[in-house]
Structure formats: structure tokens, C-alpha cells
UniProtKB/Swiss-Prot annotation:
Required for the post-translational delivery of tail-anchored (TA) proteins to the endoplasmic reticulum. Acts as a membrane receptor for soluble GET3, which recognizes and selectively binds the transmembrane domain of TA proteins in the cytosol. Residues 25-110, 173-214 are cytoplasmic. This is Protein get-1. Residues 190-214 are annotated as: Disordered. It is a multi-pass membrane protein. Gene3D superfamilies: Helix hairpin bin (1.10.287.660). The gene is get-1.
């Protein structure tokens, strides 16, 4: 069984990553992965794409056919067009319903695996010490706060450990994002400078040609 310290840290890390990336982005990524797997859903999606290609081909041919000069052909293409369009709309509704169900399932699993455990574990292990502070190193009020709410005095409670993990992970993520933002901004400025340097000789060349013409 993994240590409770590690479990709490992993849960908080996952929660912060979801908050940073975005639940909708993660759902869309997992949806694309599900469509690429050999599942009935992916077969349904492939059939829908195939029908869509057929529909576009019929539509192009229909637009290129005159309803006056080639009425019989135009009428046949029109029937095929309407039938494929109706089939596509039906398949789209089915896929949209499957996507909605998929998102709800993921949301439920994510809430249970994160928010549920965030509340359940501190309640269930509120009296369990995560680890002990060195004896006599800290004053009473520090030991009392570290053991909040019901852990033995002189220990670090699961609630305080959870707070510490959340704070440290947030700080690290914000630092990494700030560093990445600075790197991206620096590269953009460097590219702009290079473009400006490339534009200057062109302007200078035009002036020299004008002087020669004079």
C-alpha cells in the first residue's frame, strides 16, 4: 500500500494539473484517444466520416449538374443528397449524445477521484500523524497548528500536509509557467529583431538604386 503522504501529494498534483490544463481540454484529448482505439465508438465515428465524404462528393456533383439540362440526373443526385444529409444528421446526434455521456462519466470519475478523496481522506485519517516533528524544536503554537485539527500534538496532520502540498505544487506550477512565458516572449522578440534586420538592407538597397538613377 502506498504511503498516505505520497497519496495526498499525487491527488493534489493531479488536481492542480487539471486546474492548469483545463477539464474540457483533457476531456477532448481523451475523446480523441477513445476514437482512435478499436472500440464500437471509433467504428461509429469512422462510418460517420465515410458518410460525410460521400455526402460532400454528391454535393459537389449536384452543384455541377444543371436542373434544367440534366433533370433526371439532378433529381437522382438530389435524392441521394437528401438521404445522406438525413443520415449524417442522425449520426451526428448519436455521436453528440455519446460525447456528452463520455464527458459526464469523466467528470464523475474525476470528481470522485479528486474532490471526493480530498474530503474523505482528511476526515478518515484526521487522527493519524503523517510524520513527527523533532522534539523540542518548535514552540507549542507551531506544534498545535501542525497537528490541526485532531492529530497528536507534535505531529503533522493530514490536513496540514494537504495544505502544504497544495501550496508547494501551485508555486512550482506558477514558476514553471512564468519561466516558459519568459522564454517564449524572448524568442518572439528575437524573431522580430531578425525580421527587422532583414528588412533594413532591403530598404538601403532601394535608396542606393535611387541614387544611382540620379
Amino acid at each position: 500500500m502506498p504511503s498516505l503522504l505520497v497519496v495526498i501529494f499525487v491527488i493534489e498534483l493531479f488536481v492542480q494539473l487539471v486546474n492548469t490544463i483545463g477539464a474540457a481540454t483533457i476531456n477532448n484529448l481523451l475523446w480523441r484517444i477513445a476514437l482512435s482505439l478499436p472500440l464500437p465508438l471509433s467504428a461509429q465515428f469512422a462510418a460517420q466520416r465515410k458518410k460525410q465524404k460521400e455526402y460532400l462528393a454528391i454535393r459537389r456533383e449536384l452543384n455541377a449538374t444543371s436542373s434544367q439540362d440534366e433533370f433526371a440526373k439532378w433529381a437522382r443526385l438530389r435524392r441521394q443528397h437528401d438521404k445522406l444529409l438525413e443520415d449524417l444528421e442522425k449520426r451526428k446526434k448519436e455521436l453528440d449524445a455519446a460525447k456528452t455521456k463520455f464527458d459526464r462519466t469523466l467528470t464523475t470519475v474525476r470528481v470522485v477521484a479528486t474532490r471526493g478523496l480530498q474530503w474523505f481522506l482528511p476526515f478518515w485519517y484526521s487522527r493519524e500523524p503523517m510524520f513527527w516533528l523533532p522534539y523540542g524544536w518548535f514552540p507549542y503554537y507551531v506544534e498545535w497548528f501542525a497537528s490541526f485539527p485532531r492529530a497528536p500534538l507534535g505531529s503533522v496532520s493530514i490536513v496540514v500536509w494537504q495544505w502544504a502540498c497544495t501550496g508547494v505544487i501551485k508555486l512550482v506550477i506558477e514558476t514553471v509557467m512564468a519561466v516558459v512565458g519568459l522564454i517564449v516572449a524572448a524568442r518572439q522578440k528575437q524573431q522580430e529583431k531578425q525580421k527587422a534586420k532583414q528588412a533594413v538592407p532591403a530598404a538601403g538597397g532601394g535608396d542606393s538604386k535611387a541614387e544611382e538613377a540620379k
